[in-house]
Curated annotation (Swiss-Prot):
Similarity-based family: Belongs to the COMM domain-containing protein 6 family.
Organism from which the protein derives: Mus musculus
Name the record gives this protein: COMM domain-containing protein 6
In-chain residues carrying the UniProt-annotated modification N-acetylmethionine: 1
Primary localization: nucleus
One cellular-component annotation, GO: cytoplasm
Length: 87
């Protein structure tokens, strides 16, 4: 049998999952100062995550995104949700 080079990704939950989401918070903010001072007064979305690793150790992660970055992030999550609904 000849392999075409295309493979659908397969996720083995036990070996691939690196953490479990414990908490998810977000806020909309407005940048009023910047080290580079190139673009002030722009809106951004801040996302704060609490994640537990395989041993139960909880760590916090935060991400700041511009509005276009957040819109792309949101679009990708909608695509994930659509795929999940077909399973």
């Amino acid at each position: 049998m000849e392999e075409s080079g295309f493979r659908e990704p397969v996720l083995d939950a036990k070996s691939e999952v690196t953490g479990q989401l414990i908490d998810f918070q977000w806020k909309l903010g407005m940048a009023v100062s910047s080290d580079s001072c190139r673009s002030l007064k722009y809106p951004y979305v801040a996302v704060m995550l609490k994640v537990a690793d395989h041993s139960g150790q909880v760590s916090s992660k935060s991400i700041e995104m511009t509005i276009p970055q957040f819109q792309n992030f949101y679009k990708q999550f909608k695509e994930i949700a659509a795929v999940i609904e077909t399973v």
